Amino acid sequence: MYQTLDLNLAFTLVEPSPVVLITTRDQGKDNVFTLSLLMPLGFDDDSGCCNIAIMTGRWNHSARAMLKNKQCVLHVPTAEHMADTIAIGTVSGAQVDKFDRFGL
């Protein structure tokens, strides 16, 4: 379910550091991973972008895709998606198609 939010309040979605799902795409393959280490850096009024820092490492399959492609999508799941959010974080997209496995 999508909701419209005043972009000036976008930072409230990531303070204090919620658990999020981040999707990436590399070589035609989509992936999603669970992350809880992020923080807002600022908001650009001209572009409408909220700059966010995330903390992960090069060992992370999706982190490599983000470094290579310079893009990702951040999803803030609701409480009703808690079980799936946790489960997504227990497997690697290098071995499993998480979109297929979790019906995304």
Region roles according to the model:
Residues M1-T34, M39-L104:
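Active-site-proximal mixed secondary-structure blocks
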